[in-house]
């Protein structure tokens, strides 16, 4: 169908078009007002109550009494408590999460809340209904061990000697995902030192252990040959360590861990750009005798006050699990470009592109362990995380630079950045044709069997959504399906398509996100969009549209297949669905697109943005192997509450994705 035919189908909706124009104008005004003077955007990143609870526990471990943020963090925790007494992993979850609830419970008791306080009692009653504290994950046990409420002997042993392992060894730290690796190293110090800063008698958690503690805390043996092997290996290692109070090489191993940590502190004071390695590194340094006044410690704590925390009404304070200024700036710039902005007509876009170019990482990182001869050239997700650039941000950076290049005054600078980014991306392609997030071929399933790995995801295999974003960038830069890397990536994407036509979303919720990543990528490569597998995907999208014209999908879809593409409509997921259909054939799907346009127009706030309490970003689906695998559901100890998962509400998703969709729809109409 020719573009002219598509426009004809859309032209009768003149009043809607005028309304949509004002919707876009208001949204653009809001976005431009949200830009920082330096040229970037940074929306709040909401996650779950473990963030605030763990910081309160960390203050206790570090010996920081009455931290200025403590009262606000406590208020934030109380605001999030569910009616049944629990705390959940994401907004709208069907049930609370045992791990989050126990950690919050411990944090509130640590802050002086009595065991008979109504909120504490409600939480405790809920915990006991779930089977008690014995149900918690390994990471929660680590926290309880740090405050003297769980024996270190009954946590998985994390020997610092793992840093001695050569690169070819299956348990070399560089086989773990970047986020797991950066967390594992400081935990090795804490595990080796058996660090304990006990709660006072009034705050101890004896009420959570109504039965004999020894029966509650015993490390559970999991099913499966490898899991059994690691269980017995852990027992043997602990016996060995009891025999040798100072195992040979232990001090040298701890020193290596310490040096590893110190070399990787970010410029803003955090570690790894995310909360877990940051908070565990601070405690590991404390275990090694670093006072909180030491420059490294002071810098790490200062970041918390500087820009990682945010406030909400009622005196509540929260801490972000991560910051996303690079990601937010890339996608905000993408939205401006989709709305017809250029670097010559818009100083805001020009400043954003300047800032993006400045963020390219040209320093070595952990990824070079597998690619020692490859030059840097990627972009990171966070504010100051030069050690861990990622493929997804790099792909979107190349998309933005490719679109902005014609009107950017320094073409040579853009060309050099694109060349460096492309070389890095091609080198990062995995053997199966896809791309992971932070490393090449980070897919050793064996690592998921060790007792430490009962949280989120331990490895970082190739994913469809990241691969699709790379292909979209390559298409914009002139690559086509005949290029070997593109052809191999397309094979991977085709192999991952679900039987009903959609694709799984590793980094966004969920099948709507995965499908919305793939279809624009295929269009970017100038593929024939009438192919059966493509139309099947588009028809799946159409079939999931809600009666209000929008689309939504619950985080529960990661564990409940009946929730695929189902959920209350959200602005971001509606935009993803729209961009999917626009990539395939805007004319054929005009009715769905116009209903979606009306949904966005009628739900826009007077300020020009959209409300979106639902979480549409994904950190960890919780399968433990970095990819979709519902066959493991029984062994996961996870249901729709996603107790192993980590879900995210990117506060700017609700804004720049609708702008992209509306901008592309306007371009199709010729308005």
Language-model regions: role of each:
Residues 1-671:
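Preference for long, amphipathic alpha-helical scaffolds in soluble/luminal domains
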């Amino acid at each position: 169908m020719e573009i002219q035919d598509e426009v004809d189908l859309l032209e009768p909706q003149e009043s809607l078009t005028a309304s949509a124009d004002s919707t876009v104008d208001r949204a653009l005004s809001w976005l431009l007002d949200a830009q920082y003077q330096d040229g970037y955007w940074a929306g709040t990143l909401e996650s779950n109550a473990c963030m605030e609870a763990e910081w309160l526990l960390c203050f206790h471990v570090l010996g920081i009494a009455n931290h200025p943020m403590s009262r606000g963090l406590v208020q934030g925790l109380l605001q999030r408590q569910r009616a049944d007494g629990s705390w959940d992993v994401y907004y709208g979850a069907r049930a609370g999460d045992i791990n989050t609830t126990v950690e919050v419970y411990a944090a509130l008791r640590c802050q002086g809340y009595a065991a008979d306080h109504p909120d504490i009692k409600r939480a405790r009653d809920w915990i006991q209904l779930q089977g008690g504290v014995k149900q918690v994950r390994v990471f929660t046990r680590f926290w309880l061990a740090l405050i003297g409420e769980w024996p270190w002997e009954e946590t998985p042993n994390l020997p610092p000697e793992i840093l001695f392992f050569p690169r070819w060894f299956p348990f070399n730290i560089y086989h773990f995902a970047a986020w797991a690796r950066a967390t594992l190293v400081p935990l090795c110090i804490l595990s080796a030192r058996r660090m304990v800063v006990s709660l006072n008698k009034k705050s101890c958690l004896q009420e959570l252990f109504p039965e004999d503690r020894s029966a509650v805390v015993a490390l559970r043996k999991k099913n499966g040959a490898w899991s059994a092997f690691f269980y017995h290996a852990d027992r043997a290692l602990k016996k060995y360590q009891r025999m040798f109070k100072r195992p040979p090489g232990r001090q040298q191993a701890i020193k290596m861990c310490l040096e590893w940590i110190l070399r990787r502190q970010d410029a803003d004071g955090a570690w790894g750009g995310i909360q877990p390695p940051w908070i565990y590194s601070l405690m590991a340094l404390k275990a090694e005798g670093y006072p909180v006044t030491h420059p490294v410690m002071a810098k790490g704590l200062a970041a918390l006050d500087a820009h990682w925390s945010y406030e909400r009404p009622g005196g509540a304070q929260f801490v972000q699990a991560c910051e996303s200024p690079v990601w937010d700036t890339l996608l905000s710039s993408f939205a401006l470009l989709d709305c017809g902005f250029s670097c010559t007509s818009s100083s805001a876009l020009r400043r954003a592109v300047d800032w993006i170019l400045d963020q390219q990482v040209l320093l070595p990182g952990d990824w070079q362990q597998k690619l020692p001869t490859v030059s840097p050239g990627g972009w990171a997700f966070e504010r100051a995380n030069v050690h861990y650039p990622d493929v997804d941000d790099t792909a979107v950076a190349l998309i933005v630079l490719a679109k902005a290049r014609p009107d950017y005054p320094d073409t040579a600078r853009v060309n050099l950045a694109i060349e460096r980014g492309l070389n890095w991306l091609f080198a990062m392609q995995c053997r199966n044709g896809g791309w992971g997030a932070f490393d090449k071929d980070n897919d050793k399933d064996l690592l998921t069997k060790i007792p430490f790995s009962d949280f989120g995801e331990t490895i970082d295999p190739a994913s469809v959504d990241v691969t699709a974003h790379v292909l979209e960038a390559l298409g914009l830069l002139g690559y086509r399906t005949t290029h070997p890397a593109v052809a191999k990536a397309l094979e991977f994407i085709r192999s991952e398509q679900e039987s009903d036509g959609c694709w799984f979303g590793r980094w966004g919720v969920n099948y709507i996100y995965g499908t919305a990543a793939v279809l624009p990528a295929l269009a970017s490569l100038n593929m024939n969009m009438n192919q059966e597998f493509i139309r099947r995907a588009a028809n799946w999208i159409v079939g999931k549209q809600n009666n209000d014209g929008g689309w939504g999908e619950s985080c529960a879809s990661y564990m409940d297949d009946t929730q695929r593409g189902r959920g209350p409509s959200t602005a971001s997921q509606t935009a993803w669905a729209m961009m999917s259909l626009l990539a395939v054939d805007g004319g054929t799907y005009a009715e769905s697109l116009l209903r979606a346009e009306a949904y966005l127009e009628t739900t826009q706030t007077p300020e020009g943005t959209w409300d979106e309490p639902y979480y549409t970003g994904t950190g960890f689906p919780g399968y433990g192997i970095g990819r979709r695998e519902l066959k493991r559901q029984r062994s996961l100890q996870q249901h729709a509450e996603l107790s192993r998962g980590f879900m995210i509400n990117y506060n700017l998703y609700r804004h720049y994705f609708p702008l992209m969709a509306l901008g592309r729809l306007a371009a199709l109409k010729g308005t």
